[in-house]
């Protein structure tokens, strides 16, 4: 695979990840709006959707990862699996609190980027040299 083809595949993956992130954030925003309106079942439903989107992310990204070279594909898949595994655990535990905390470190402050945003930014910056931390 040529470097140009790999870079195109990587650009496609980054775009796909940013779109998935936007879906996750939209579900979270809906959940918070429902909570503000006193609609706890609606809040829980949208937090569950957030977790489901993240849980499926690693699997859903496979077609985007396929064109990447082996080691690069592995490193990207490993990073995405970390997010998906946490989300699957929150669903298995049926923990709305855990679902709400997905993507955020313990010391997260409003206005700071979430962990998925930081990861996508690192992927974009490092390109084919991306490694998990």
Show where each model-derived region lies:
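Generic structural concept
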Residues: 14-21, 51, 55, 80, ...
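Amphipathic alpha-helical binding modules
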Residues: 81-133
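Short terminal alpha-helical segments
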Residues: 2-48
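Short, charged, amphipathic alpha-helical segments
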Residues: 40-52, 74-81, 114-117
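Short amphipathic alpha-helical segments that mediate assembly, nucleic-acid/protein binding
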Residues: 6-10, 28, 58-61, 73-76, ...
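Short, solvent-exposed, charged loop/turn and helix-capping segments
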Residues: 54-82
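A structural signal for well-ordered alpha-helices, especially hydrophobic packing surfaces
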Residues: 21-28, 54-65, 87-94, 124-127
């Amino acid at each position: 695979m040529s470097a140009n083809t790999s870079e195109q595949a990587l650009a496609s993956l980054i775009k796909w990840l940013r779109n998935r992130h936007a879906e996750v954030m939209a579900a979270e925003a809906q959940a918070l709006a429902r909570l503000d309106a006193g609609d706890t079942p609606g809040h829980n439903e949208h937090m569950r959707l957030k977790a489901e989107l993240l849980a499926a992310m690693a699997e859903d990204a496979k077609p985007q990862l396929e064109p990447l070279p082996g080691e690069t594909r592995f490193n990207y898949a490993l990073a995405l699996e970390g997010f998906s595994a946490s989300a699957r655990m929150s669903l298995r535990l049926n923990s709305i609190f855990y679902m709400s905390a997905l993507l955020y470190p313990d010391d997260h402050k409003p206005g700071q980027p979430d962990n998925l945003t930081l990861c996508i930014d690192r992927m974009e910056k490092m390109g084919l040299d991306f490694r998990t931390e």
